Amino acid sequence: MGQKTNPNGLRLGIIRTWESQWCVNDKEIPNLIKEDFLIRKLINNFTKKSAISQIDIERLKEKNKNRITISVHTAKPGVIIGKDGDTRNKLVAKLKELTQKDVNLNVLEVKNSDKNALLIAQNMAEQLENRMFFRRVQKMAIQKALKAGAKGVKTLISGRLGGAEIARSEGHAEGRVPLHTLRADIDYAAVEAHTTYGVLGIKVWIFHGEVLPGQTILDTRKPFASQSSNTPNRRPRNFKGGNNNHVNAKKN
């Protein structure tokens, strides 16, 4: 069932950790879940073009429950920080107004955006909205990820592809993407692209490598790690959604 589940959720507690970390009484859980949702929504809407890949929220100190530490991972930290930190200060003020708590905001740079599934999916959505051909969009994204050091990449686009009357799904994959291997560090993201023909769904899977005993997920996601020479060279393959029977891609 590794093909059907969300790879991020399937690996929680094994090689991945939670983006929201706090320990409270059962009665407080619903309120904090809602608060985390509103915090992420506010940050994403406040800085729409800042290429945010992840937002971590921590409430770890029981003695100081009114303090929240928020870490924003972005490929464009300058957009969030702003000139002399003006944009960051405005964002902190809005977060304090929303939560009525003391907020500590950390802005962390994503050093290699070509290996991040969410940033790749967002970039693909932007290109599709600009009417670029969907097959070219997939191949360009895959080539960039492999060049950046990914061990394998798989993409899937669903909807009215090319303006067709009947919606369908079409994907492209290169390298290894072992969805059934729980120690495999697989980054997954799903994004929507709003085009003139309707909404297209975009899914991206990126295999960074296997997390062996004594290692962490950070060891497989170094800023740049060239592909191992032991990795078998597999031919690119196209496939259609809902069908796991891969078809060899035609040679150009």
UniProtKB/Swiss-Prot annotation:
Ranges for domain KH type-2: 39-111
Compositionally biased residues, Polar residues: 241-252
Keywords: Ribonucleoprotein, Ribosomal protein, RNA-binding, rRNA-binding
Phosphoprotein in keyword set: no
UniProt xrefs under InterPro entries: KH_dom, KH_dom-like_a/b, KH_dom_type_2, KH_sf_prok-type, Ribosomal_S3_C_sf, Ribosomal_uS3_bac-typ, Ribosomal_uS3_C, Ribosomal_uS3_CS
Example GO BP: translation
Cellular component terms (Gene Ontology): cytosolic small ribosomal subunit
Single GO molecular function: structural constituent of ribosome
Pfam families from the UniProt entry: KH_2, Ribosomal_S3_C
PROSITE patterns reported in the protein's UniProt record: KH_TYPE_2, RIBOSOMAL_S3
Region annotation (Disordered) ranges: 222-252
HAMAP family linked to this entry: Ribosomal_uS3_B (MF_01309_B)
Assembly mode: Part of the 30S ribosomal subunit. Forms a tight complex with proteins S10 and S14.
Job of this protein: Binds the lower part of the 30S subunit head. Binds mRNA in the 70S ribosome, positioning it for translation.
UniProt cross-references to NCBIfam families, sorted A to Z: rpsC_bact
Family stated for the protein in its record: Belongs to the universal ribosomal protein uS3 family.
Name the UniProt record assigns to this protein: Small ribosomal subunit protein uS3
Organism this protein belongs to: Phytoplasma sp. (strain PY1)
Primary gene name: rpsC
